[in-house]
């Protein structure tokens, strides 16, 4: 895959929106945040028919930490009329947030009229009744939007666990939020849901006479098992409710569920798919729509990992020759979650014995009766590094591995390993490519992950302040 400089191309909307190209990351090399933001605004952010979005920001004082004055952003996503065509999947964490508990109930409601997202506080395990707080805000928003009731509002929260949301401050700022609604661009919403994210994430495709637009946030506490972080996918095509729900479950499985930043599954993970019911849909085109939906979700997954907290490299692990999908994904997750391998990649260190260790750790724990030792072949950057039960290494190969990892770097660390500003835009869509053929079956999958750097520790040691 070659990467093009955005400035070298004409700004033709038809050229850039033909397809999402998410399976290879963004096809462009961005030289600045301004160039990336211009690309999103000009070529990705147009809303499907029948949607509007808004954001508003305000200051508040957390009751659990009055010494830490904070800022909250509320983001509103609204179909032109309440719609019965909506789907959602949520975290499987045993301590789900109050918004997740409310959201699961919303799936049984006949219609959805709005999605409300707040940053800074996740409303998880908060004393005093997190569900009641979420419902109170939903009821008040419903009044401002003239909906039938709060049951038509889906709440989502992201941020600090254990704090209670500032209901009074949120309710006070709802009128301004509603006033800010606009139907041109999803970019304000993509920016509004960010927390430790360094840049907004938008993917879109025109398909079947309509449009799909997706946004997502998430940079840490990421290893989903049902959904991931917060992601909102909008379409104007009138696809039946039961079909949307089946499609979302299927697509999430090998996109969002096949990535990991730090192995920690959030208590608030939510993915929604909502139709504004504006454009008739021919069910004969369902496969085409599913392919486009998969592209959008995979693209957002790649964007999330590329903006993982402290990330200097993104690893793409392709596992083949497995006996089952579970085995393939398990091997891939074991590799991208290995702290030793993640550190080696961060340092452009070709210590690939750690890669073999990570595969063996998983297989020895979960599939000890399957002998892969002399059947497995591993490549990094297209170079064979393990075959016939032995490492294949020499000075020339190690030099190629170092060059491959350096070429995939997102940022050049400053002296001491820390970079104060980090990367606030994705400079390219390259990966540290790892291919693992287990040689015992026909199942295959792809898993994404990042390296482990000083910045990750610094960010998470100082998150609340």
Swiss-Prot record:
It is found in: Mitochondrion matrix. GO terms for biological process: L-arginine biosynthetic process; ornithine biosynthetic process. GO terms for molecular function: glutamate N-acetyltransferase activity; L-glutamate N-acetyltransferase activity. Substrate binds at residues 195, 217, 228, 309, 460, 465. HAMAP family: ArgJ. SUPFAM superfamilies: DmpA/ArgJ-like. InterPro entries: Arg_biosynth_ArgJ, ArgJ-like_dom_sf, ArgJ_beta_C. It catalyses: N(2)-acetyl-L-ornithine + L-glutamate = N-acetyl-L-glutamate + L-ornithine; L-glutamate + acetyl-CoA = N-acetyl-L-glutamate + CoA + H(+). It holds the Pfam family ArgJ. GO terms for cellular component: mitochondrial matrix. This protein may be expected to contain an N-terminal transit peptide but none has been predicted. Pathway: Amino-acid biosynthesis; L-arginine biosynthesis; L-ornithine and N-acetyl-L-glutamate from L-glutamate and N(2)-acetyl-L-ornithine (cyclic): step 1/1; Amino-acid biosynthesis; L-arginine biosynthesis; N(2)-acetyl-L-ornithine from L-glutamate: step 1/4. Its EC number is 2.3.1.35, 2.3.1.1. This is Arginine biosynthesis bifunctional protein ArgJ, mitochondrial. Keywords: Acyltransferase, Amino-acid biosynthesis, Arginine biosynthesis, Autocatalytic cleavage, Mitochondrion, Multifunctional enzyme, Transferase. The alpha and beta chains are autoproteolytically processed from a single precursor protein within the mitochondrion. Heterodimer of an alpha and a beta chain. Catalyzes two activities which are involved in the cyclic version of arginine biosynthesis: the synthesis of acetylglutamate from glutamate and acetyl-CoA, and of ornithine by transacetylation between acetylornithine and glutamate. Belongs to the ArgJ family. It comes from Phytophthora infestans (strain T30-4) (Potato late blight agent). The active site is at 228 (nucleophile). Gene3D superfamilies: ArgJ beta chain, C-terminal domain (3.10.20.340), L-amino peptidase D-ALA esterase/amidase (3.60.70.12). The record marks 227-228 as: Cleavage. The record marks 158-159 as: Involved in the stabilization of negative charge on the oxyanion by the formation of the oxyanion hole. NCBIfam families: PRK05388.1 (NF003802).
């Amino acid at each position: 895959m070659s990467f093009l400089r955005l400035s070298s191309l004409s700004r033709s909307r038809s050229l850039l929106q033909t397809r999402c190209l998410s399976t290879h990351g963004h096809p462009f090399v961005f030289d600045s945040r301004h160039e990336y933001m211009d690309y999103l605004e000009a070529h990705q952010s147009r809303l499907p028919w029948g949607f509007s979005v808004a954001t508003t920001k305000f200051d508040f004082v957390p009751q659990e930490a009055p010494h830490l004055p904070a800022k909250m952003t509320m983001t509103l996503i609204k179909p032109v009329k309440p719609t019965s065509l909506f789907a959602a999947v949520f975290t499987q964490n045993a301590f789900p947030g109050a918004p997740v508990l409310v959201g699961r109930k919303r799936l049984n409601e006949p219609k959805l009229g709005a999605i409300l997202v707040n940053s800074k506080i996740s409303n998880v395990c908060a004393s005093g009744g997190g569900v009641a707080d979420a419902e109170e805000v939903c009821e008040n928003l419903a009044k401002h939007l003239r909906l039938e009731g709060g049951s038509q509002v889906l709440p989502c929260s992201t941020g600090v666990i254990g704090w209670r949301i500032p209901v009074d401050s949120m309710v006070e700022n709802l009128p301004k939020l509603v006033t800010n609604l606009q139907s041109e661009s999803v970019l304000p919403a993509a920016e509004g849901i960010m927390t430790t994210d360094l840049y907004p994430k938008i993917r879109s495709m025109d398909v079947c006479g309509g449009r799909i637009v997706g946004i997502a946030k998430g940079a840490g506490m990421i290893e989903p098992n049902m959904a991931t972080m917060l992601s909102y996918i909008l379409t104007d095509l009138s696809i039946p409710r039961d079909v949307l729900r089946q499609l979302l479950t299927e697509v999430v499985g090998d996109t969002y569920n096949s990535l990991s930043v730090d192995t920690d599954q959030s208590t608030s993970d939510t993915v929604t798919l909502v139709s504004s019911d504006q454009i008739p849909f021919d069910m004969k085109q369902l496969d085409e729509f599913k392919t486009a939906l998969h592209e959008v979700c995979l693209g957002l997954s790649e964007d999330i990992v590329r903006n993982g907290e402290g990330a200097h490299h993104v690893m793409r692990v392709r596992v083949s020759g497995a006996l089952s999908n579970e085995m393939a994904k398990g091997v891939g997750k074991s590799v991208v979650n290995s702290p030793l391998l993640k550190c080696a990649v961060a340092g452009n260190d070709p210590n690939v014995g750690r890669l073999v260790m990570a595969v063996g750790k998983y297989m020895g724990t979960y599939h000890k009766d399957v002998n892969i030792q002399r059947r497995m072949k591993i490549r990094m950057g297209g170079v064979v590094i393990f075959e016939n039960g032995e490492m294949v290494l020499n000075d020339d190969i190690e030099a190629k591995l170092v060059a491959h990892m350096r070429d995939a770097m997102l940022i050049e660390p400053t002296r001491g390993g820390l970079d104060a500003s980090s990367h606030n835009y994705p400079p390219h869509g390259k990966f540290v490519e790892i291919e693992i053929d287990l040689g015992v079956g026909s199942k295959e999958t792809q898993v994404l992950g990042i390296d482990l750097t000083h910045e990750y520790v610094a960010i998470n040691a100082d998150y609340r302040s």
